[in-house]
């Protein structure tokens, strides 16, 4: 039973981590394109998702803070 639960949790966490990384990449892409408005929108979309993953324990709160600080 524990093995099944662990696998289910691992897949769920992998999905959430992938989603978070995608949002972060979108911010980097928008910044690289030079479109300030798109970059701001991408950052505003990314910020609550990163915070939520830190609250849920997927990443450490300091890592979430570092991602946000590096992208501001």
From Swiss-Prot:
Q: Name one GO cellular component term.
A: cytosol
Q: Which UniProt keywords apply?
A: Ribonucleoprotein, Ribosomal protein, RNA-binding, rRNA-binding
What GO molecular function annotations does the UniProt record carry, in alphabetical order? small ribosomal subunit rRNA binding; structural constituent of ribosome
Q: Does the keyword NAD apply?
A: no
Q: What InterPro entries does the database record attribute to this sequence?
A: Ribosomal_bS20 (IPR002583), Ribosomal_bS20_sf (IPR036510)
- Swiss-Prot/TrEMBL GO biological process terms: translation
Judging by the UniProt lineage, the source's domain of life is: Bacteria
Query: One Pfam family from the UniProt entry?
Result: Ribosomal_S20p
Q: What does this protein do?
A: Binds directly to 16S ribosomal RNA.
Q: What is stated as this protein's family in its record? A: Belongs to the bacterial ribosomal protein bS20 family.
Protein known as: Small ribosomal subunit protein bS20
Question: What are the leading ranks of the lineage?
Answer: Bacteria, Pseudomonadati, Pseudomonadota, Gammaproteobacteria, Enterobacterales
């Amino acid at each position: 039973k524990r093995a099944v639960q662990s696998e289910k949790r691992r897949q769920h966490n992998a999905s959430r981590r992938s989603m978070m990384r995608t949002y972060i990449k979108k911010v980097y892409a928008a910044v690289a394109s030079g479109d300030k408005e798109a970059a701001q929108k991408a950052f505003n979309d990314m910020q609550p998702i990163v915070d939520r993953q830190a609250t849920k324990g997927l990443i450490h709160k300091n890592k979430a803070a570092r991602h946000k600080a590096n992208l501001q």
